[in-house]
């Protein structure tokens, strides 16, 4: 995308840990940032109106470290994929056989930064909905990136999944050798992925998921034990257990 335009919603121009900001990352990459929509509402029409001959990609960034609630609207990866396939005037009839290559002919990629990298449905455990990597790939995103630690539960690394054509292009980039993960990191990621072959095993073996999905009664029991031990010490400060909503991260 060097020298080309990357279209991003204004509501997704996030700053992550370490003061890294999406606009600055894009600038360093050589891409030209093109903002659309507003902080709280962005529609598919905003993306369509911003497309030009210089457009190389639609970038969707999941706001995993904050929320905008209330009068809001956003565009899904699936909608962006559908838009990218409709931007090219086909000279042949679109059939199931050539549909896969239709997006590639338009020349506009759909790239999504998921951040935490969830592989299971957290709603099954009473937690807020988070888009999974599988859902976004199935929705049509050409490349999905996420962290190897955080909710994924592995080593600190960046993970890229997507269409083979684009992953291969990144494999052949001159910077790969300097940025590639070492063997220990790769081994750690592989072992975590093996856990995900069985969701129940993943929830039990991966510390982050185990703590996030721990039943409320179990948490209460542990809290009561800690409080009792503290209070039995005769400290001047007494502890009591109360119901609350905790935040992870």
Report each predicted region and the residues it spans.
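Catalytic-core signal marking the mid-to-C-terminal active-site face
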Residues: 227-249
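Short, conserved beta-strand edge motifs with alternating hydrophobic and charged residues
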Residues: 147, 204, 238-242
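Short, structured loop/turn "capping" segments at alpha-beta junctions
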Residues: 167-170, 199-203, 237
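Conserved PLP-enzyme active-site core in the AAT-like
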Residues: 1-196, 231
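Structural signature of PLP-dependent enzymes
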Residues: 196-226
